[in-house]
Curated annotation (Swiss-Prot):
UniProt-listed SUPFAM superfamilies: P-loop containing nucleoside triphosphate hydrolases
Binding site for ATP: 248-255
Keywords noted in UniProt: ATP-binding, Hydrolase, Magnesium, Nucleotide-binding, Signal
Organism: Arabidopsis thaliana (Mouse-ear cress)
Identification of the protein by name: AAA-ATPase At5g40000
Domain of life: Eukaryota
Keyword S-adenosyl-L-methionine included in the entry's annotation: no
InterPro entries: AAA+_ATPase, AAA_N_dom, ATPase_AAA_core, ATPase_AAA_CS, Mitochondrial_chaperone_BCS1, P-loop_NTPase
PROSITE patterns tied to this protein: AAA
């Protein structure tokens, strides 16, 4: 009993000392030092024999400061407030912090300065606040905002809203389009790190895209109408999203079209690799981790998974075996993808575009590409004369039907030869940075004649086979 009494006496003495020291600190030190000293005293107090919970109650009882945490991610999605706060605090770097880090943006002569400190002090309408970037034991990141209780109304009703809105406006102003690709789920960390990204610097634009000008204008108008359609989609009661199906032979510009879309709208691109997704649950999580103002792309969807028109036939021919496989979690199903596109979970974000590409439209399951799901079907076909003129302007600075005497010969060859815009561009591209118009056009004519001869020979072979088996 005596030992216990001595123990409590020692603890009581320590607490009394801490109370006295804290009262002295309140009178002597400025606010920005009080936070640091308070944390030191609390850590010292927590080393006493009292449990952590008692220490926390003590802190809440006697501390005049309030804390608010802003986690990087919620259960199913990224916390947009976190990135806005992070951007806002970075904008204060040169004014509020002494430790900075510099980085150089590509193709820029200047340096971008960012803070290299976890703690930042800010002031708002006479109230002092302290921000701290924290990583907990599980690797989760969050911002901790600390302020005096007397400023609670000002901070919660006005300051936080100001910080988030200011951060979002800076993000929009300085936005750099990024290209994302999904990581394997084994690389995910507590619901984070689902996507990795790089800066997107593809120069494609609709002005340089080799396709029929009228079709191009129709696509551009549709994209702009969508990006400005927030109130319209709200009025008709539909999620603010749109689907585009790009189909055609290889080399006809499907990937370039996606790049031009992103550059026109300043949207991020999420290149979804379905073969890296185990099941529908993972697909749903990946969707909720994408941002608004984005293009979600599944290229060569006929090769990504079994979403072809033969899917139903395969299922009916293997019911006995399929009974076991139906429970296999390591697969993305058609219903899971359809829910991804336009199910309930597809409305978890705004201003999203979904793009499918395929070389074989006839192979896809009709349910996947029906109108309303893929709102616009865009055929990217072989190079036409109109597309050639755009390429000639891009590569050779030749503009108009009468820009060169060889144009009429090229026009005639294009009308009877199937060749992709990529192959045409390859023949027009300057060698050794030297543009030789006549040489480039003659190279193209030779390539067209060779391809035309090959295609005719293939047609003759087919005719002869038909006669034999006929």
């Amino acid at each position: 009993m005596m030992m216990m009494g001595d123990s409590f006496g020692s603890i009581g003495s320590s607490m009394a000392s801490l109370f006295f020291l804290w009262a002295t600190i309140q009178q002597i030190f400025p606010d920005h030092l009080k936070i640091t000293i308070k944390e030191f005293l609390l850590s010292s107090f927590q080393q006493l024999c009292f449990a952590q919970r008692v220490s926390d109650h003590f802190t809440n009882l006697f501390s005049p400061y309030v804390e608010i945490h802003f986690p990087e991610s919620d259960e199913y999605s990224f916390n947009q407030a976190f990135s806005a706060i992070d951007t806002y605090l970075d904008s204060k770097a040169t004014d509020k912090t002494k430790h900075l880090r510099g980085s150089q943006v590509k193709e820029s002569k200047g340096l971008v300065l960012k803070r290299n400190e976890a703690k930042v002090r800010d002031e708002y309408k006479g109230a002092n606040v302290w921000w701290e970037r924290v990583v907990d034991n599980d690797g989760n990141r969050y911002y901790k905002l600390t302020f005096h209780n007397r400023a609670r109304t000002l901070i919660t009703n006005s300051y936080i809203k100001y910080v988030v809105e200011e951060g979002k406006s800076i993000i929009v102003k300085n936005k750099q389009t990024r290209l994302f690709t999904n990581n394997l789920s084994t690389q995910w960390v507590f619901g984070q790190n689902m996507w990795r990204s790089i800066e997107f610097e593809h120069p494609a634009s609709f002005q340089t895209l080799a396709m029929d000008p009228k079709k191009k204008e129709e696509i551009v108008n549709d994209l702009i109408a969508f990006s400005n359609g927030k109130e319209y989609y709200k009025k008709i009661g539909k999620a603010w999203k749109r689907g585009y199906l790009l189909y055609g032979p290889p080399g006809t510009g499907k990937s370039t079209m996606i790049s031009a879309m992103a550059n026109l709208l300043n949207y991020n691109i999420y290149d979804l690799e379905l073969t890296a997704v185990k099941n529908n649950s993972e697909l749903k999580k990946l969707l909720t981790a994408t941002s608004s103002k984005s293009i979600i792309v599944i290229e060569d969807i006929d090769c990504s998974a079994d979403f072809t028109s033969n899917r139903i036939k395969k299922e009916s021919n293997s019911r006995e075996r399929y009974g076991k496989e139906d429970k296999d979690e390591n697969s993305v199903t058609l219903s899971g993808l359809l829910n991804f596109i336009d199910g309930i979970w597809s409305a978890c974000g705004q201003e999203r575009i979904v793009v499918f590409t395929t070389n074989h439209l006839e192979k896809l399951d009709p349910a996947l590409i029906r109108r309303g799901r893929m709102d616009m079907h865009i055929e990217l076909s072989y190079c036409t004369y109109e597309a050639f003129k755009i390429l000639a302007k891009n590569y050779l600075d030749l503009d108009g039907d009468d820009a060169h005497p060889l144009f009429s010969e090229i026009k005639a060859l294009l009308e009877e030869t199937k060749i992709s815009p990529a192959d045409v561009a390859e023949n027009l591209m300057a060698r050794n940075q030297q543009i030789d118009v006549d040489k480039s056009l003659n190279l193209l004519i030779s390539a067209l004649e060779e391809e035309n001869q090959y295609q005719r020979s293939q047609q003759e072979k087919k005719k002869s086979k038909f006669k034999i088996f006929g």
